């Protein structure tokens, strides 16, 4: 609106690829009533205007297409050749209507703009390639071997789908996947929250630049979450390999199990609850690591600035290096059943009352406690090195 005023014209003047125009010019929308079409195995949708895109299961065993698209953009091209359905609307005549606060998916007349493609339930598409410039994308009850969905400004929702490979790319919008089964799933999000619920399969990767990531009640071979700025919530996950890399944000992980568990957090609190893995590695640069009911054979924990509470329901080997913060170890059995090496440069050491203190040493402010390897503690070891902070050992 400010553009028109600055140019000395009427408010609402906008720049487009075709020049300077008024958004109040309205062309008749392009319409295609719901129409049955021939079967197809490949799908290509390109929407350069404002519209919602829906790909969903039909109620019968037939294929259909329908749309209403903004007449101020280029004329849509709809083709079905050699088993491939292609629908495209370029923005040759398009106005930047999103700058004026219009609702997502509405054209200048206020009428809802959309494309809906219907596919028989259970059909497996070979490929699906979808791009939507400004609007939501909903993929529901449709299967595909190779699926790629890109939304520049809008939400993407996946429901009850099976796929060999699925890639979601979002610039500005939320992503949601429910009851998705995939061999390979990749989600790249610039701005927006991402939610995975009841997903299953092999390799799942989520990369989020700015926005939270939530997963719940899922089972995969591997799950990798990479975040720049946003909180993480993982609840109910079975994965052979779990990897979390977080730069800024809190992480809450509960009811997860598998073989290899890795968390790297640069700035934020890490909460672990009911975690069962064979090997665990946790690195926190700035933030507390607070845990309860942890079961693992090998644990490697590194902290720079923050406290550690490690509540072990099962523990065979633990290595902990802390730079500045308190360490609280809650062990499942007596300290004497481990080979022990505790070292504190500046801080106090607190041990259970019944622990033999003959290996306790204090010299020049440094505190150490050791229990040598023996048949009694064969194969089990606890090593803690803390530069500045207290160390407390207690039992569950």
Where does each model-flagged region fall?
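Short linear S-[DN]-x-LW-Φ motif typified by the pepsin-like aspartic protease active-site region
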Residues: 5-92, 96, 105-131, 136-150, ...
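Short, surface-exposed interaction patches in beta-rich subdomains
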Residues: 159-161, 166, 175-189, 193-396
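An anionic, turn-rich surface loop/hairpin at beta-sheet edges
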Residues: 95-107, 358-366
């Amino acid at each position: 609106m400010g553009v028109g005023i600055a140019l000395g014209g009427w408010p609402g003047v906008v720049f487009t690829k075709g020049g300077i125009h008024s958004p109040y010019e309205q062309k008749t929308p392009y319409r295609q009533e719901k129409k049955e079409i021939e079967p197809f195995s490949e799908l290509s949708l390109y929407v350069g205007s404002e519209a919602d895109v829906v790909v969903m299961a039909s109620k019968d065993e037939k294929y259909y297409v329908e749309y209403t698209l903004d007449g101020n953009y280029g004329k849509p091209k709809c083709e079905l050749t050699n088993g491939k359905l292609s629908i495209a609307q370029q923005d040759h005549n398009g106005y930047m209507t999103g700058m004026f606060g219009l609702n997502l998916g509405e054209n200048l007349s206020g009428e809802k703009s959309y494309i809906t493609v219907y596919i028989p339930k259970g059909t497996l598409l070979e490929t699906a390639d979808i791009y939507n410039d400004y609007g939501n994308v909903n993929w529901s009850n449709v299967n595909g071997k190779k699926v790629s969905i890109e939304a520049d400004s809008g939400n993407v929702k996946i429901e009850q789908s099976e796929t060999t490979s699925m890639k979601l790319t979002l610039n500005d919008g939320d992503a949601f996947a429910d009851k998705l089964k995939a061999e390979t799933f990749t989600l790249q999000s610039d701005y927006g929250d991402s939610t995975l619920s009841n997903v299953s399969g092999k390799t799942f990767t989520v990369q989020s630049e700015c926005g939270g990531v939530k997963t719940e009640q899922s089972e995969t071979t591997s799950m990798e979450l990479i975040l720049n700025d946003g909180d993480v919530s993982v609840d109910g996950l079975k994965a052979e390999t779990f990897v979390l890399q977080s730069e800024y944000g809190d992480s809450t992980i509960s009811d997860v199990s598998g073989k290899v568990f890795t968390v790297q957090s640069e700035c934020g609190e890490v909460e672990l609850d009911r975690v069962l893995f064979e090997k665990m590695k946790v690195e926190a640069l700035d933030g507390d690591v607070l845990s309860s009911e942890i079961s693992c054979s090998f644990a490697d924990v590194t902290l720079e600035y923050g406290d550690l509470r490690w509540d072990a329901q099962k523990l065979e080997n633990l290595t902990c290096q802390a730079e500045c913060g308190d360490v609280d170890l809650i062990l499942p059995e007596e300290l004497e059943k481990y080979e022990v090496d505790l070292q504190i440069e500046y801080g106090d050491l607190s041990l259970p009352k019944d622990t033999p203190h003959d290996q306790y040493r204090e010299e020049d402010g440094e505190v150490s406690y050791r229990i040598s390897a023996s048949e009694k503690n064969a194969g089990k070891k606890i090593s803690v090195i803390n530069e500045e902070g207290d160390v407390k050992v207690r039992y569950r």
